[in-house]
Amino acid sequence: MPHWAEERHRRESNYVALEAGLDEGESIRRSEHSRSGCGADAGCWRCRGGPGRGSRRSRRSRGPGGTAGPVDPPAVDLLAPPPDPLALPPALDPLAPPPPDPLAPPPPDPLAVPVAAGPVAGQDPTSFVGPPPFRPPTFNPVDGAMVGVAKPIVINFAVPIADRAMAESAIHISSIPPVPGKFYWMSPTQVRWRPFEFWPANTAVNIDAAGTKSSFRTGDSLVATADDATHQMTITRNGVVQKTFPMSMGMVSGGHQTPNGTYYVLEKFATVVMDSSTYGVPVNSAQGYKLTVSDAVRIDNSGNFVHSAPWSVADQGKRNVTHGCINLSPANAKWFYDNFGSGDPVVVKNSVGTYNKNDGAQDWQI
């Protein structure tokens, strides 16, 4: 072969080798190997890349600079049987957890701040915007207070309100959780708001009265139910019975029955003087009295308390002997005094009549 033809053949062999993924040195060796008259023999040291060097496969597995190059595909077993299209899938492990649902909502963030779900009847979680239609009012409960679940919101104005609807629209009540409720007026200078049912335990309540703001919280749902049919007071905390006390309520003689209804704690005194003359009964009359009592918890503005009465312990749990108050033993009255606070409800049932006096504490009868 002429020299120029041999050189052309060598270059063409290099191009073919480079396109097949071989480096230039390997292509030169192939060219020399072909000129030497050797066939493509796997046992030839030339075909293996020369003495002391790796095979062609090992050299192809290295890229430029010694880095990993393309890897040959795995071998296929031509004798393996084809997959059975009718074969059943492997049985699921009944103890294995179900796979996650890609459409399921993400779990709640335990660190997220609770937000009211939206307005309900009587509530408005938005901030008041605009000129205030009244001077800054005062609130009860006071800002930051912890109260019972029967506590209403009391808003006192500096001057009488002529347009009550406008005033109500400027007062935004909201709570977490949201609960429906209503406004009601006690006087031209006082409006109140309460939920239709007791506040849930541990509720956060916010008030925005034309830009004057306040907030409070409820504690546990502590409820006393005085049942005149059994002469027992049952106390529940968050729906679970915690205490049952024998009691005595208002006697029939003289019309002193304790009326049915929902009361709530207004205030309490370690000791207080009770004087029948304060409601028109002379102290020296047959129904009169004047004595000092302990652990007295006021539940209305008509003279009714839950209090200690050591003189009526023998009657408690059996009969009614009081002038309207709820008598407890000294130990039970002390527990009641220590645990019940502002806004905790006292429900009287199976008695006579209904609590309907306009004494400023009849919120749950309105």
Curated annotation (Swiss-Prot):
CDD domains named among the record's database cross-references: LDT_IgD_like_1, YkuD_like
InterPro entries reported for this sequence: Big_10, LD-transpeptidase, LD_TPept_cat_dom, Transpep_catalytic_dom
Keywords assigned: Acyltransferase, Cell shape, Cell wall biogenesis/degradation, Peptidoglycan synthesis, Transferase
UniProt feature, compositional bias: Basic and acidic residues: 26-35
Pro residues bias (residue ranges): 80-111
Gene3D superfamilies: 2.60.40.3710, L,D-transpeptidase catalytic domain-like
UniProt-annotated site: Binds to carbapenem drug (covalent), residues: C325
Record EC number: 2.3.2.-
PROSITE patterns: LD_TPASE
Span list, region Disordered: 21-119
CC annotations in GO: extracellular region
BP GO terms, sorted: cell wall organization; peptidoglycan-protein cross-linking; regulation of cell shape
Entry annotated with the keyword Transferase: yes
Keyword field contains Ribosomal protein: no
Pathway: Cell wall biogenesis; peptidoglycan biosynthesis
Residues in L,D-TPase catalytic domain copies: 222-349
Activity regulation field: Is irreversibly inactivated by the beta-lactam carbapenems via the formation of a covalent adduct resulting from acylation of the catalytic Cys; imipenem is the most efficient drug for in vitro LdtMt4 inactivation.
Pfam hit, one: Big_10
Active site: H307 (proton donor/acceptor), C325 (nucleophile)
GO molecular function terms listed in the Swiss-Prot or TrEMBL record: acyltransferase activity; peptidoglycan L,D-transpeptidase activity
Binding residues annotated for substrate, in chain numbering: Y289, S302, G303, N327
Function in brief: Generates 3->3 cross-links in peptidoglycan, catalyzing the cleavage of the mDap(3)-D-Ala(4) bond of a tetrapeptide donor stem and the formation of a bond between the carbonyl of mDap(3) of the donor stem and the side chain of mDap(3) of the acceptor stem. Is specific for donor substrates containing a stem tetrapeptide since it cannot use pentapeptide stems.
Protein name: L,D-transpeptidase 4
Species per Swiss-Prot/TrEMBL record: Mycobacterium tuberculosis (strain ATCC 25618 / H37Rv)
